[in-house]
Design a protein with these regions (language model features):
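Zinc-dependent metalloendopeptidases
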Residues: 1-250
Length: 250
């Protein structure tokens, strides 16, 4: 199990605007509990999510999205993240009406609820697919569980937001804005499958700041392709981002 430590500011608002101030150190574990008894009792720091009527395991589609997101994070950071089935873990991911109407996650913390992710029950998260709202929600909430904050909000290590020119989903999955200058109170306006499929540039910078950068991923010559049917990007034939060096292609 990991423990939580404080994060220092970098004096770069592009990064500091995403840093909550907390991160994990040591081997990070995650799980998909299927019973309220999988959680500590009492659930310190939480809002009784495990014991609320309607508790359920995370939909399989969201579990797949989380696993995919963790694979991405492992590819460009030095974090060590291990799966622990349905058991106790640093990051426990499930569904509860307490999270309605959408979802939320707790920042890393040395208390029962620290790092846990909760999806609400008003949205059909079983519909999660690469590039849609539900899928990107998994990336967003896992980002919180690892120490990322909302890009449009101040607070965190330096009490700054991400600069407005980069506060949108083109640069970070932690933004409430579909495009630069969009309202944060009227919801996203992306097309159905026009949401980020990966962590974006500022997310990667912030995650690497907290957990170290792994430059071995895609460190050789790289060929980038794009599917005009699905919009998915491929690197050397694989739908995975983050060039670690080498020569780019087309």
């Amino acid at each position: 199990m990991a423990t939580t430590v404080l994060v220092s500011a970098t004096n770069n608002a592009e990064i500091d605007g995403l840093l909550s101030g907390y991160k994990w150190t040591g081997t990070i574990t995650y799980s998909f509990p299927d019973a309220s008894s999988d959680y500590p009792n009492p659930y310190y720091g939480g809002s009784s999510e495990p014991t609320t009527s309607g508790f359920a395991s995370a939909p399989s589609a969201m579990q797949s999205a989380i696993n995919y997101a963790i694979g991405l994070i492992l590819s460009y950071t030095n974090a060590t993240i291990q799966y622990n089935g349905t058991g106790s873990a640093d990051i426990m991911i499930a569904q509860s009406p307490s999270a309605n109407p959408t979802s939320y996650a707790y920042y890393p913390g040395n208390y029962a609820a620290g790092g846990d992710v909760w999806f609400g029950t008003k949205y059909n998260y079983s519909l999660a697919q690469l590039g849609n709202y539900y899928f990107t929600t998994a990336l967003h909430e896992l980002g919180h569980a690892l120490g990322l904050k909302h890009s449009q909000e101040t607070g965190g290590v330096a009490n700054v937001a991400v600069p407005s020119a980069h506060d949108d989903s083109e640069y970070t999955v932690m933004s409430y804005r579909s495009y630069v200058g969009a309202s944060t109170s009227t919801g996203y306006t992306n097309e159905a499958y026009g949401y980020p499929q990966t962590y974006m540039a500022n997310d990667i910078l912030a995650l690497q700041t907290m957990y170290g950068a792994d430059y071995t991923t895609q460190s050789g010559n790289t060929v980038y392709t794009w599917s005009p049917t699905t919009g998915q990007e491929f690197i050397n034939g694989v739908g995975q981002p983050a060039d670690g060096g080498g020569i780019g292609g087309s």
